[in-house]
Amino acid sequence: MKKAASIVMAAFLALALSACGAAKSGEDGKAQSASGNATEKYTFGTDATYPPFEFQKDGKYVGIDIDLMNAIAKEEGFDVEIKPMDFKGIIPAITANQLDGAIAGISITDERKKVVDFSDPYYQAGLSLIVNEDNNDIKSPEDLNGKTIAIKKGTSGANLADQYAKTYGATIKYFDDSPSMYQEVANKNADATLEDFPVISYKIAIDPNAKLKIVGDRLNGDFYGIAVAKGDTELQKKINDGLKKLQENGEYDKIVEKYLGSAAK
């Protein structure tokens, strides 16, 4: 009997501990509001090597995209977790349900819209052609014949570089992040790169050793959007509603000006 009683007691304790663990897990998974109702928490991917939109400073993720996503979450009453990763893996992670969405200077393209949905556009970027500061031979894409283009994988710049390779006979060298492709051009191991205008403008402005310059006009007029899983209209609406409020109350402008100044909006 004592043995049976011990077994029953052990089972009871195990069940109680299991229940406590489950409750703790639930608390970790969702934040509790003051009213006791659970707050939705979404995980968003980003590429933390893309200043001024997302980068690390003093051990924290900051930038236009990070501040904007946090402000939208605050407006709409949900929590957000930022998960850094390589840019090329962001869209696949959304389609594999490993992320709820992503904000990473992602250009809205027809190809991407086949697999994810986007928020309303929140920033017009546009690609620029960048060369070493000593290079006076390349002034436009037509001058890329026989030249080498350094480019980051999975970007709209990579798509345009591929077109230039076919049209002008350029060679492409791929990289996983923007700093690596910048350095390749700075070291004169590649002749040019393609980057979003606000991003490269920021890089050149804050880095006296960049050894880069922009040549010619903007090559296109890409718009950035916040990506969500295909068909997730609920999250898409929350983002659009929050973004609209921030644009109307002036907070959006404050975020952009914080990193780029009013002239760069």
Predicted ranges, named:
Residues Q56, M69-F78, G157-F175, I204-P208:
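Ligand-binding cleft/hinge of the Venus flytrap
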Residues K74, D79-D143:
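Acidic, polar ligand-binding/catalytic clefts
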Residues G21-A23, I66-E75, N135, K153-T155, ...:
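Extended ligand-binding regions for polar small-molecule ligands
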Residues G29-G105:
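Extracytoplasmic small-molecule ligand-binding "clamshell" domains
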Residues I106-K114, D162-Q163, A186-N187, D191-G221:
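A ligand-binding cleft/hinge motif common to bilobed small-molecule-binding domains
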Residues A22-S33, E81, S156-K173, K211-V215, ...:
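Ligand-binding clefts/hinges and TM-proximal coupling segments of bilobed small-molecule sensing domains
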Residues A16-A19:
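C-terminal motif of bacterial Sec signal peptides marking the signal peptidase cleavage site
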Residues A48, Q124-V131, F197, S201, ...:
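Periplasmic-binding protein-like
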